[in-house]
């Protein structure tokens, strides 16, 4: 797969997560956005209002073979004071969410 195609898959998942937060939490669309591909940090950028509704740091992985533990470690490294969360997806499957079971 081309790098541009892989980035497009990741970007689409990030946008899907943003749309779900807007739809289900009532988050203001201007207070939440998908991070540009290739940028460091969490994949979904949230403002103060959205953080109050959803105190998670989101890492998105849209890959056929995901190392869940490595993805969770990446989310943990980027989470700051928020709870790390990984959204994983593969072709033709629904997205799943990984969070610490003891949170």
Annotate each predicted stretch with a short phrase.
Residues 1-103:
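Catalytic phosphate/metal-binding cores of nucleic-acid and nucleotide-processing enzymes, i.e., regions
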């Amino acid at each position: 797969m081309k790098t541009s195609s892989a980035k497009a898959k990741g970007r689409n998942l990030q946008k899907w997560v943003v749309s779900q937060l807007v739809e289900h939490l009532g988050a203001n669309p201007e207070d939440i956005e998908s991070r540009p591909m290739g940028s460091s940090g969490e994949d979904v950028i949230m403002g103060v209002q959205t953080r109050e509704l959803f105190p998670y740091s989101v890492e998105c992985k849209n890959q056929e073979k995901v190392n869940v533990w490595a993805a969770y470690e990446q989310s943990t490294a980027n989470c700051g004071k928020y709870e790390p969360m990984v959204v994983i997806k593969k072709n033709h499957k629904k997205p799943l969410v990984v969070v610490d079971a003891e949170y």
